[in-house]
């Protein structure tokens, strides 16, 4: 679900544990056409609160990855995976025939890599996945904060 939060675009994913994509920013705002985008991903529920800063090159194609999953609504064999530039956010997708299961991984940055957190969200193939891809695309294309 796409919304506004503190004057910035927010994408919320999930049910029991909510994933929030927010606070999009350019890593080097003084560089013209800087491709490095940073944003926060927060996983939150009554029992957990985890936040990671994600570094990408113009989103690393996360929206394209999700759009391809939506286009393959009839299903695929095995696991499809995506990772951000520095591996702080990972995503794996499995199609069960009735649902697409997305496992979102939030990771501590190297070299420490002391922790990692994963949560799986279920989505209907096709339109539900297309909406998620569109929301992530709008988020990544929104005006980064200074």
Predicted features by range, described:
Residues 1-48, 54-55, 139-146:
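Charged, alpha-helix-forming regions
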Residues 13-14, 20-24, 42-44, 53-57, ...:
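A structural detector for beta-sheet-dominated domains
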Residues 15-17, 46-50, 87, 98, ...:
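Short acidic/polar mixed-charge low-complexity motifs
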Residues 32-34, 48-62, 119-130:
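Short, low-complexity cationic-aromatic patches
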Residues 33-38, 81, 89-113:
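Intrinsic, low-complexity N-terminal interaction/targeting segments
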Residues 62-69, 132, 136:
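Short, structured motif recognition centered on aromatic/hydrophobic residues
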Residues 74-89, 142-146:
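Short glycine-rich, low-complexity/disordered patches
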Residues 109-146:
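Mixed-charge, glycine-accented linear interaction segment located at domain edges/termini
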